[in-house]
């Protein structure tokens, strides 16, 4: 699933399409995508994992789910979910994704302060929302898009390793300093992810995600296919990542070579 930094990269790559008129619309979306024909694209935006195309009176929300992808001025050898053919010969194709229409202004639909890579990101708001969920696992809290819009499973695993917190720690048990580190590092790592992704070196910087040994102390990493309410893959080090709060979970599976993401 593309995480927030990847959507920012797409937003920047597609930004020049704003102001262009849609001359033709293709795709197998079940939505009424033909309403986009002869409309002028007013803006290209992102919120977390949502890619947003703004038109007069409404916007198109694209969520890339688990296997979605996109192409600008080229096509894949499979049917597109939505293809927008703009004036000037520009084309935007998106694949294997969810396409939805949003009525009205985007400001009415989105809380921009929750977007970890946005200019309106508010860490104080994130801390307040976390404190309202004292029993939540930190692994689930990081994936809560109402708190950390754009954070996905890779960022989750890497952030928790960076701040030395076990994924099954409870939010309410974290010291204030650790809670602040959790919030701050979610944003910091997202921008690191963005830079590495643009340079095509992201996977080279993984410390624990899909790895077998902790690079900090050499301990075999613990791995679970499904952890927390989110039921997402988790990789962590029992030596350097401290568990805060009561442990109510099962014993982790032994470390082993994980499947490719």
Where do the language-model regions lie?
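Structured catalytic/nucleic-acid-binding cores of DNA maintenance enzymes
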Residues: 1-261
């Amino acid at each position: 699933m593309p995480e927030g930094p990847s959507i920012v990269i797409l937003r920047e790559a597609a930004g020049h399409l704003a102001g262009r008129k849609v001359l033709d619309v293709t795709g197998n979306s079940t939505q009424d995508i033909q309403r986009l024909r002869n409309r002028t694209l007013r803006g290209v935006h992102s919120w977390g994992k949502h890619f947003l195309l703004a038109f007069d009176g409404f916007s198109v929300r694209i969520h890339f789910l688990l296997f979605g992808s996109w192409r600008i001025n080229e096509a894949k050898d499979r049917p597109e979910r939505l293809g927008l053919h703009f004036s000037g010969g520009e084309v935007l194709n998106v694949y294997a994704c969810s396409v939805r229409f949003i009525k009205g202004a985007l400001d009415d639909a989105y809380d921009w302060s929750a977007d970890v890579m946005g200019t309106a990101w508010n860490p104080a708001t994130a801390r307040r929302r976390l404190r309202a969920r004292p029993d939540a696992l930190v692994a689930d809290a990081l994936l809560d898009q109402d708190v950390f819009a754009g954070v996905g499973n890779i960022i989750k695993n890497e952030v928790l390793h960076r701040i030395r917190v076990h994924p099954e720690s409870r939010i309410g048990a974290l010291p204030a300093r650790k809670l602040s580190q959790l919030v701050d590092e979610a944003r910091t790592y997202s921008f690191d992810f963005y830079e590495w992704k643009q340079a095509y070196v992201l996977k080279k910087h993984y410390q624990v995600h899909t790895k077998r040994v902790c690079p900090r102390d050499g301990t075999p990493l613990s791995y679970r296919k499904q952890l927390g309410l989110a039921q997402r893959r988790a990789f962590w080090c029992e030596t350097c990542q401290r568990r805060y709060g009561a442990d109510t979970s099962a014993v982790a599976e032994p470390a082993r070579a994980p499947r490719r993401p």
